[in-house]
Amino acid sequence: MPGPCNCIETNVCICGTGCSGKCCQCGDACKCASGCGCSGCKVVCRCSGTCACGCDCTGPINCKCESGCSCK
């Protein structure tokens, strides 16, 4: 049985308990709310300081951070 967020096998992205799945995308772009765990996710986007990644962030190459923030 695949993990709850093994997006490649299930095509479903389920975020950790109490975590928002807003803007969550399946496949290689599986993503949960900031600070939430999702086993099987392969996307890493780090924004500067306390800034969060934007909804259309799908990886380091097109990392999108909140307005006025930069991706590092």
From Swiss-Prot:
On whether Transferase is a keyword of this UniProt record, the answer is no
What InterPro entries has UniProt attached to this entry? Metalthion_mollusc
Q: Where does Cd(2+) 4 bind?
A: 45, 57, 63, 71
Q: Which UniProt keywords apply?
A: Cadmium, Metal-binding, Metal-thiolate cluster
Q: Which residues bind Cd(2+) 1?
A: 15, 19, 32, 36
Assembly and interactions?
Homodimer.
Q: What does this protein do?
A: The metallothioneins are involved in the cellular sequestration of toxic metal ions.
Annotated protein name in UniProt: Metallothionein 20-III isoform A
| Source organism phylogeny | Eukaryota, Metazoa, Spiralia, Lophotrochozoa, Mollusca
